[in-house]
Amino acid sequence: YFQKKGYDLTKLQGSVNYDPMGKMMVKGKDLSNFITTAKELVEVLAPLPKFRCICVNAIELNNAGSYISQELGYALAWGNEYLSKLVEAGVPAALAAKKIKFNFGISSNYFLEIAKFRAARMLWADIVKEYHPQCNRQPECPNKAEDGTCLCACKMVAHAETSTFNLTLFDAHVNLLRTQTEAMSAALAGVNSITVTPFDKTYETPDDFSERIARNQQLLLKEECHFNKVVDPAAGSYFIENLTISIATQAWELFLKVEDEGGMLEAIKAGKVQEAINASNKARHDSVSKRKEILLGTNQYP
């Protein structure tokens, strides 16, 4: 289709969110033999360097009530599972890594979310480097390391979407405060794209008004706050740098635990991920009921 329209394939950007492991986790479907389809999809879209097709929908964990380090740790194991399976199937590591995209959720924990995205990019780059992706780009790519490693392949493409876990049914306009701060933290963290959930999604199909407000929330950050003009504005902040290291350490420990137990696919098939997230969900609801975790408009300033 793109070729018939005469588009420049090297400039087309987009994604196809193929995530069989996500469906296994959420729906319980056995799609463990996904590698044939995944490999074909990656190879078909190889001429589109900026088009991603393998997706890590970590937002499902966020919306189910996971903690921040949990979401990141499982997301890394999730992405590594796809990457290792593709490489084992004969796909070059650089191509496989460039076709993986991460969809994260954003909670209301402002500074921790900024740190989460910064830690995610750092850890994913470390994981991809272990596969030694080779840069075969012509002419010579300026992002090629001395040992031939393709640094472009090490860059994480992250989409962020405001969480539905903390959206409330009553006094729904307070949801606007939550989604605005969530979008702000993702923008400051330098994600590639953001989706703001309409404030009324908890009780009805979003209408034209709520969808327009959701779009305008992003435009405020771009056109009035100019968050798109600065690269990593949080860099150098001791507090955020310290949080980044802390979250990275916790997430990495979970990642290593999952890998030691056979990888993300085995963890999902055994129900370990689902059990851990359900336990976190229960713990967070208990924390809200006891006012250990603040939910504005519900247990604080109701």
What is each model feature region?
Residues 53-55, 101-103, 157-160, 175-176, ...:
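Structured core elements
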Residues 27-43, 171-175, 250-272:
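Phosphate/diphosphate-binding loops
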Residues 113-125, 217:
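Extended amphipathic alpha-helical segments enriched in small hydrophobics
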Residues 38-42, 46-85, 177-254:
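Mobile "lid/hinge" segments at catalytic clefts and subdomain interfaces of large enzymes
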Residues 163-172:
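Flexible, glycine/threonine-enriched loop-and-boundary segments that flank and lead into catalytic domains
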Residues 212-302:
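Catalytic-core signal marking the mid-to-C-terminal active-site face
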Residues 1-109, 113, 134, 139-146, ...:
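Catalytic alpha/beta active-site cores
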